[in-house]
Amino acid sequence: MFALLFGGILADSLIKRGFKVITVRKTVNTIGFFGSSIFLILIPFQDTLVNILVLLCLVNTCSGICQGGFGVNHADLGPKYTGSLVGIAGSIGMIAAIFSPIVAGYVLEFSNSWNLIFYICSGILIIGGFYYLLFASAEKQFD
């Protein structure tokens, strides 16, 4: 929760300082996605439960911070239609939420280890982070 607030405050303060909205969105999103990816990659190399829990907390922190990026980008694209855009994007995003536990079950059955799952999640974050860097826009597209 605090990371969500921090991500929003960070993004707003950078915009108020004169940074372009798209630059701020991409920066905050990059911190969140690539930060989470790094911490997920480090998890399999830990020997203690405490270290793993700290890394998982850092993953969640980065996930909250990136909400100041893609999480509010809908309002940039179509201020009048933000609710509809969030609903459509959320519905599409739920497809992954439906299939990821199934895929994780197969991966666990195949590998008997969570390590591969952490690597897959990290890879998805890296791909998503680069995709956002390349294609994200803050220009109003729906008026």
Per-region residue spans from a language model:
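Transmembrane alpha-helical cores of Major Facilitator Superfamily
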Residues: C57, T61, G87-I95
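Transmembrane alpha-helices of Major Facilitator/SLC transporters
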Residues: M1-I15, G32, S37, A97-F99
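C-terminal transmembrane helical hairpin of 12-TM major facilitator-type secondary transporters
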Residues: I22-G69
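Multi-pass alpha-helical transporter architecture, strongest
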Residues: I43-P44, C121-D143
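A membrane-interface helix-boundary motif in multi-pass transporters
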Residues: V21-T27, Y106-I124
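Paired intracellular helix-loop junctions of major facilitator superfamily
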Residues: I15-R17, N73-G83
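Cytoplasmic loop-to-transmembrane helix junctions
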Residues: V24, Y81-I88
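Interfacial helix-cap and linker-helix signal at transmembrane-aqueous boundaries
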Residues: L10-A11, I15, V103-N112
